[in-house]
Amino acid sequence: MEQDFSWDMLRWQDLYLAPLCLLLVYFAARFYVKKYRNTPIGKYVVPAVTLRLVGAFTYTLVIGFYYGFGDSHNYYQGLIDMFHAVKDDGSMLGNIVMKGKVEETDPLYRYFYYDGTYALKYYILEPRTYNVPRFALPFGLLFNRSFLCVSFCLSFLAFMGTWRLYKMFYELYPHLHKKLAYAVLFMPSTLFWGVSLLKDTFCMAAMGFFVYAAYSVLIKK
């Protein structure tokens, strides 16, 4: 078992991983650009995605060099521990995917216990804490546990959910598309606190998908 304790939010590998990640994010954003090109709301896609990416980078700098410690550090260390668990034993991935919480008797738990931190081995037993790095793990595996790249991917996930919410309001009030864009897509606080390795990011994304799904079933039909 490899010990990897680090709260360095920026690593040398980000020099080549971050541009690659940004390329993939904008490639995915092209789907929205093409789909809504001939609508009044199509022009908001690229700015909404870009501002979230800027917010993710800014958050990484602030949490890494100003605060120096916070919830994101614990989530990130949890992701690193899961990364090494899967690296050591591929079957761990199935265990992480299928289980919504970790117990002290699980083979996975030793990675949190011996990672060099003091508190994480206790925090990670709380499902709400455990599930943040769990849901972010696919991006961590894809980009070699880069915090910045994980943040970029999660910022796009948040955009997807927020866009669904904006689309619902646009369908209800098409004449207010500009004001709705400012209120839903460009709210400053969400561009900082809802674009990285945080519970808020997943909550925003899930809320957008859930609300639009409920609207589609109960109202739009």
Model-found features: residue ranges?
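Alpha-helical transmembrane segments of multi-pass membrane proteins
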Residues: P19-L22, F156-F159, T201-Y212
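Extracytoplasmic catalytic/substrate-binding loops of multi-pass membrane glycan-assembly enzymes
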Residues: I63-G78, K87-Y113, Y123-F135
